[in-house]
């Protein structure tokens, strides 16, 4: 049944909804073929250190072809713990604002991008929180329909997505009583968007700064303090901050 379901979903997405653009990848090996090729092979364990490369994270934010940034095991672990420290900020009750294993985080951005890869895939994993993956965030009506099923406490997005949600007539009917954190990244946050979001949801949008080359969260705003659009926040735990001209 899983194989039949997968075939049905792929067929609808590709042939009916036409969501897959035409492409050609020379010498490409499909994921299913790779699984078949490796089915009879054993696992060879290789010792690794924190300085060994764990991920080739590709970025289009460069001249020419997309380039893969080499991220080490130590880089991934350190960044997860830095974000974990940020989420451990205390509320008025003396307890962490973001509670491990109890939060529902909405993940509408692609996990192949460094922002969602770090914040959702890596950092929610280490904190034991639940990610809700939004498969097609461009379908704003479907996005909002999915949000209605959850008492979500966090949402990561970017300016254009926030505007699209705010402009939809059904967005205001959502329950925002559990929303503790909204974060914007990838592009600049417009002041008018931040003000509209705060007025509708009651939750201010935080911003940060990071690079693909060192993972996404180099600097971020405190969770409890009022935020000002354009302010990138403080360096994360263990980070240095130096401005050069």
Q: How should each PLM-predicted stretch be described?
A:
Residues 45, 54-81:
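Conserved AMP-binding A3 loop
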Residues 4, 8, 19-20, 129, ...:
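Gly/Ser/Thr-rich phosphate-binding loop
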Residues 53, 59-62, 105, 111, ...:
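Conserved S/T- and glycine-rich ATP-binding loop of Class I adenylate-forming
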Residues 77-104, 112-153, 168:
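Conserved AMP-binding/adenylation subdomain of ANL enzymes
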Residues 1-50:
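ANL superfamily adenylate-forming
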Residues 1, 67-70, 107, 130-136, ...:
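Short beta-strand->loop structural element characteristic of the AMP-binding/adenylate-forming
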Residues 242-245:
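Conserved beta-loop-beta connector loops within the AMP-binding
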